[in-house]
């Protein structure tokens, strides 16, 4: 299964915020959209960074409530790992596990933002694959038993 299969089923819409958005505003965006991370982008198509709930928690623990007034650019991850639509889901799962992150932006061939995949998306697609495999094996066993 490829990343393109995930994007096709969930859509390529990505919630972004400009780098000068304050952390308080970011929290509102996360809550409103019921998401765990947001791509930081000045134009909605280039990736300047990514900010997750974990980044916010770490910043709050380190700097206190004052961080809520800071721009997201102060707490975002600037070196964003990305993937392309043609990548295999297993590669993505391995990268997410190794890097210990739960969201990865998908980029087009020219590096423009083209979607985002979460670990939940990966788990959902793997469950679907396993169910199909289980059903195929069950059918095979039933056919062999008759």
Locations of the language-model features?
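Tandem CBS (Bateman) regulatory domains
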Residues: 1-13, 52-97, 119-146
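The conserved cystathionine-beta-synthase
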Residues: 16-34, 40-42, 64, 82-100, ...
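Short, charged helix-to-loop "capping" segments that act as catalytic/coupling loops
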Residues: 2-20, 40-47, 108, 144-146
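A glycine-centered beta-loop-beta connector
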Residues: 30-33, 38-55, 96, 104-122
């Amino acid at each position: 299964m490829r990343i393109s299969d995930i994007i096709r089923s969930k859509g390529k819409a990505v919630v972004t915020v400009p780098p000068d958005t304050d952390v308080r505003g970011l929290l509102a965006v996360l809550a409103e959209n019921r998401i765990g991370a947001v791509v930081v982008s000045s134009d909605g198509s280039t990736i300047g960074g990514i900010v997750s709930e974990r980044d916010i928690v770490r910043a709050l623990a380190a700097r206190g409530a004052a961080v809520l007034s800071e721009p997201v650019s102060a707490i975002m991850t600037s070196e964003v790992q990305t993937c392309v639509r043609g990548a295999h889901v297993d590669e993505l799962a391995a990268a997410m596990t190794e890097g210990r992150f739960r969201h990865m932006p998908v980029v087009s061939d020219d590096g423009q933002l083209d979607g985002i995949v979460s670990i939940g998306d990966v788990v959902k697609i793997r469950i679907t694959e396993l169910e199909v495999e289980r059903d195929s094996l069950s059918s095979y066993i039933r056919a062999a038993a008759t």
